[in-house]
Amino acid sequence: MEPLSHRGLPRLSWIDTLYSNFSYGAEDYDAEGHEEQKGPPEGSETMPYIDESPTMSPQLSARSQGGGDSVSPTPPEGLAPGVEAGKGLEMRKLVLSGFLASEEIYINQLEALLLPMKPLKATATTSQPVLTIQQIETIFYKIQDIYEIHKEFYDNLCPKVQQWDSQVTMGHLFQKLASQLGVYKAFVDNYKVALETAEKCSQSNNQFQKISEELKVKGPKDSKDSHTSVTMEALLYKPIDRVTRSTLVLHDLLKHTPVDHPDYPLLQDALRISQNFLSSINEDIDPRRTAVTTPKGETRQLVKDGFLVEMSESSRKLRHVFLFTDVLLCAKLKKTSAGKHQQYDCKWYIPLADLVFPSPEESEASPQVHPFPDHELEDMKTKISALKSEIQKEKANKGQSRAIERLKKKMFENEFLLLLNSPTIPFRIHNRNGKSYLFLLSSDYERSEWREAIQKLQKKDLQAFVLSSVELQVLTGSCFKLRTVHNIPVTSNKDDDESPGLYGFLHVIVHSAKGFKQSANLYCTLEVDSFGYFVSKAKTRVFRDTTEPKWDEEFEIELEGSQSLRILCYEKCYDKTKVNKDNNEIVDKIMGKGQIQLDPQTVESKNWHTDVIEMNGIKVEFSMKFTSRDMSLKRTPSKKQTGVFGVKISVVTKRERSKVPYIVRQCIEEVEKRGIEEVGIYRISGVATDIQALKAVFDANNKDILLMLSDMDINAIAGTLKLYFRELPEPLLTDRLYPAFMEGIALSDPAAKENCMMHLLRSLPDPNLITFLFLLEHLKRVAEKEPINKMSLHNLATVFGPTLLRPSEVESKAHLTSAADIWSHDVMAQVQVLLYYLQHPPISFAELKRNTLYFSTDV
């Protein structure tokens, strides 16, 4: 590449530009979790904005004369309010003018591609078709949609640039453009098939060959050339090129946009969506991403890469895994001193010709995966939340950068440990000539992506081979440049201007699915990202023997900094010979999978938002509604006092003439009868519509309650019990005693803590105390079945702690900056309070009242 100068800009391919501009964030990690400090290499320069338009507009040519403005390789921070705002806004106009010119050319290219489509379709139904309808739809797949998206974008942006002033806003246009990248995902997935189909049709049909070799592209308005001839293959590549260009422009726009400008948050969001999309698309579409040649002399390309946890010698190691066209390579980033070029160290590789996936029977014979203790994972999460709050406080108080960096380092260490120790879903691969390897993933979606990518490549005519030490060194050396995933997926690697994600509760109704070719037993699971990785949150019932399942099931999913929702559709396996005994080994067949971004503007509206996810020809319809954490923290008393939900516990017990509310006794009895061995009891969401039905029956004191309970899904019954405690107008352990519980659990001296915590129980009103002790003994019995139901005392404390303790007056916590801060400060303590009582020897109501050892003073 020629050196940069102030006289002009070097011409770069989009992929070179991508590497130059997209190496953000710390790449400094070690597989064992040690962070390394690294400075920029001496003499390094930042890369200016590059536009590769075939014809540069006069406006764009003008800005290339100076070349003094550059884009930092780190994420753009934007201009401080009022700092050179005029210059920044003028630069915005220059960037937009150049982008608009290239957008015009891109639209002309799409038009040229669409031009032959109509006549080809017209001949498809005649006796002498050039192409079949199927071939036409494959070759021109999504081109019309992409054209319409960009034409609308261009038509809206053009007048804003032409009638420029400092008040012009266009961030919403870029945000909308980014939100439509799903169309590009569909195009990219089909790209290879489209090229192969076009090539085959050219070979078999001279007429189509003539058309595809000379498509006329209209020149821009200011250009002397009216038309240029371009091949169909070259034009089909343009949409892929365009996504990267748009992302680079967003960086430039953010750099030259004041942070207090209304466009700034919209451009940030557009950039986040674009970057997520870029990291997810399959990079084998670019033939220039070549490492070395395969044994057959073909180019070896990188298809997929990412960070996975490997079980190596009974310990977990974070690896960077690279899937090439004919080999899977597992590597670790070497430790290097500051300023040195980083390199990968190859741990092992398997030629795809030798790679096999073990059968369920073979997997059973493999050593079982022992999950990390849940309470330790929860401790990590609460530490991370607390550190996030401390960092925000330091920033708000304009604290020292060293203190903030120390906190960030601690947060990275905890997030790294969580990422390393939380995955439990096994992904086993085997080299037919020797060793087996085991990765652990947190998401079945991710496992499916890796498996499908490998199996797709294995359909080709692959040969077995052994790499020489030199060949292995060359291949490993290429990984640093070729990688598409640069950073470990932890939130501490995020930039300050990136969206923190959503905190609260997402209500999702999975309505139905269609597009299945034959009847099957079908169900869906829902995954959301949390703390940087995806976890499964809910599962619909199995709809049997159908091609059009109608679930209409509602779920409440807790979000912790979440940005995406995934839906996976499975065919249920009832063949017992194929069922794996490993609880984490899902052997049901994935029929389709899809993902959507949780756009805060769309999700945070109070109304239900209905959408459709397309996956492998299958369409799943769902609706969602989001409740922010600050809203979900509020307890709302019931307006009517005849029911049980939202009514004071003392009122209910007095009306029923009972010591423990009937709803609590019946739900606990049913759980102990048939749900105490249910995996994830109280943790897994019940169907929301079932829970609402039970709520209505209990509120109406319907005589059919017992019959309905016996027929209802056990997770719905567990969910009803949780909902009852959550909707109490004041928490079971009362608002009055809440501060004292927080102080008591923080005491260091065991004897003082014992006296204080027991005294607080004695201070509770009798209905509250008796109900609490009744629930406490039940939860202990549930935890006794932990080897089967996977619910430890800590798990149960995490589920019930906030429900039993969370105060009704959240507004009193005005000193805390956000709902997320409230959560991170208080939840840890709420969980610890309940855990203290769960771990305590049995507490008798009579002995507690009789015992005079505890303090008798009022709280």
UniProtKB/Swiss-Prot annotation:
Q: Which residues form the Rho-GAP domain?
A: 647-845
Assembly notes: Interacts with DLG4.
Instruction: Write out the domain note.
Output: The central Dbl homology (DH) domain functions as a guanine nucleotide exchange factor (GEF) that modulates the GTPases CDC42, RHOA and RAC1. Promotes the conversion of CDC42, RHOA and RAC1 from the GDP-bound to the GTP-bound form. The C-terminus is a Rho-GAP domain which stimulates GTP hydrolysis by RAC1, RAC2 and CDC42. The protein has a unique structure having two opposing regulatory activities toward small GTP-binding proteins.
Q: Which InterPro entries match?
A: Abr/Bcr (IPR037769), ABR_PH (IPR037865), C2_dom (IPR000008), C2_domain_sf (IPR035892), DBL_dom_sf (IPR035899), DH_dom (IPR000219), GDS_CDC24_CS (IPR001331), PH-like_dom_sf (IPR011993)
Point out the gene that encodes the protein: Abr
Under the heading Pfam families, the entry gives: C2, PH_19, RhoGAP, RhoGEF
Domain annotation C2: ranges: 484-613
What SUPFAM superfamilies does this protein's entry cite?
A: C2 domain (Calcium/lipid-binding domain, CaLB), DBL homology domain (DH-domain), GTPase activation domain, GAP, PH domain-like
Q: Where is the composition biased (Polar residues)?
A: 54-64
Q: Which residues carry this modification: Phosphoserine?
A: 57
Domain (DH) spans 91-284
Which CDD domains does this chain map to?
A: C2_ABR, PH_ABR, RhoGAP_Bcr, RhoGEF
Q: Where in the cell is it found?
A: Cell projection, Dendritic spine; Cell projection, Axon; Synapse
After gene disruption, what is the outcome?
Mutant mice show impaired spatial and object recognition memory with reduced maintenance of long-term potentiation (LTP) in Schaffer collateral-CA1 pyramidal neuron synapses.
- Extract the signal peptide range: none
Source organism per UniProt: Mus musculus
Tissue distribution: In hippocampal subregions, expressed at similarly high levels in the dentate gyrus and CA1 regions, but lower in the CA3 region.
Which domain of life, per UniProt? Eukaryota
Q: What is this protein called?
A: Active breakpoint cluster region-related protein
What are the start and end residues of every segment in region (Disordered)?
Answer: 29-84
Recite the UniProt keywords alphabetically. Answer: Cell projection, GTPase activation, Guanine-nucleotide releasing factor, Phosphoprotein, Synapse
